[in-house]
Amino acid sequence: TCYPEFLQDGAQVVRWVKDNIGRFGGDPDKIFLKGHSAGAHIAAMLAIDGRWLRQVGLSPGRDIAGLIGIAGPYDYLPLRDETLKVIFGGADRPETQPIFHVTPGAPPSLLMTGGRDRLVEPGNSVRFAARLTAAGNAVTVKTYACVGHYFIVAAIAPLLRVFVPVLRDVDAFITTTLASPLRIAPLENPVA
């Protein structure tokens, strides 16, 4: 699937969740978008660039409680990989990048990155967090020093949780965000 189809598909998924989560015991007012790598890119675009959710009658600021991005590519132009150029319709299209859609009123965000990630360099999260903060949005960045691109998500598995507290940090972010009447994420290590 190419840009923008995967974002349109993602928006349809969020619409379905909003309409159906109650049947499964969930709360339609407590929807968090979470993804790893390309999934983090999609989650960020849906949470930050309102045009995708508006197409299905939703709004990021109203319908998304928070964004959790794990090793996400948020600011990675120009594209060098030929496959990515095909997927995104060219090497230099800023409209495909979450960082270029940041405005005030975005949902609280938790951005997690591995200090040894060589596929999606940690600067993606740092730059995206700085842009979110500059727009007045709540953001927390967690950098796990000795972790690469794949282990950061593998650490969610029960046997690997002792090595990296990814799941514990996600749980704390969700709990704190939902406890706040303003839905403001904790600013443990804000980015200036």
Model-derived segments and spans:
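Cap/lid segment of the alpha/beta-hydrolase catalytic domain
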Residues: 1-5
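Primarily recognizes the serine-hydrolase "nucleophile elbow" in alpha/beta-hydrolase
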Residues: 12-82, 94
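Hydrophobic anchor at the start of a short beta-strand
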Residues: 31, 109, 129, 138-140
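Acidic beta-to-alpha connecting loop that harbors the catalytic carboxylate
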Residues: 73, 115-118, 146-148
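Active-site nucleophile elbow and catalytic-triad environment of alpha/beta-hydrolase enzymes
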Residues: 86-101, 106-107
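Short beta-strand/loop motif that positions the catalytic acidic residue
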Residues: 105, 111-113, 117
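Conserved alpha/beta-hydrolase "acid-adjacent" motif
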Residues: 118-127
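C-terminal catalytic histidine-bearing segment of alpha/beta-hydrolase fold enzymes
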Residues: 126, 133-192
